[in-house]
Curated annotation (Swiss-Prot):
Protein name, per record: Small ribosomal subunit protein uS17
Keyword terms of this UniProt record: Ribonucleoprotein, Ribosomal protein, RNA-binding, rRNA-binding
InterPro entries: NA-bd_OB-fold (IPR012340), Ribosomal_uS17 (IPR000266), Ribosomal_uS17_bact/chlr (IPR019984), Ribosomal_uS17_CS (IPR019979)
BP terms from Gene Ontology: translation
Keyword Magnesium: no
Job description of the protein: One of the primary rRNA binding proteins, it binds specifically to the 5'-end of 16S ribosomal RNA.
Source organism (scientific name): Azorhizobium caulinodans (strain ATCC 43989 / DSM 5975 / JCM 20966 / LMG 6465 / NBRC 14845 / NCIMB 13405 / ORS 571)
Length: 82
């Protein structure tokens, strides 16, 4: 079975070797017929502490690394400096 890959934005990088990634999904509400956005936060492993807040990253399912970490960061894009 292939591993799931999700795209999201880093919202926290305070922990060592861990980032918190917010993944947003969109769906049509069955009753209102409107597009609704829902988000969920995932803790992901970042071995080199490369990613910082605002970066767009792709995370992939992995074996459990701790109580909360079941994902690893596989690639991403740095946020543009202003």
């Amino acid at each position: 079975m292939p591993k799931r890959v999700l795209q999201g934005v880093v919202v926290s990088d305070k922990q060592d070797k861990t980032v918190v990634v917010r993944v947003e999904r969109r769906f049509t509400h069955p009753l209102l017929k409107k597009t609704v956005r829902r988000s969920k936060k995932y803790h992901a492993h970042d071995e080199a502490n490369t990613w910082s807040i605002g970066d767009t990253v792709w995370i992939e399912e992995h074996r459990p690394l701790s109580k909360l970490k079941n994902w690893i960061v596989v690639q991403g894009e740095k946020r543009a400096e202003v």
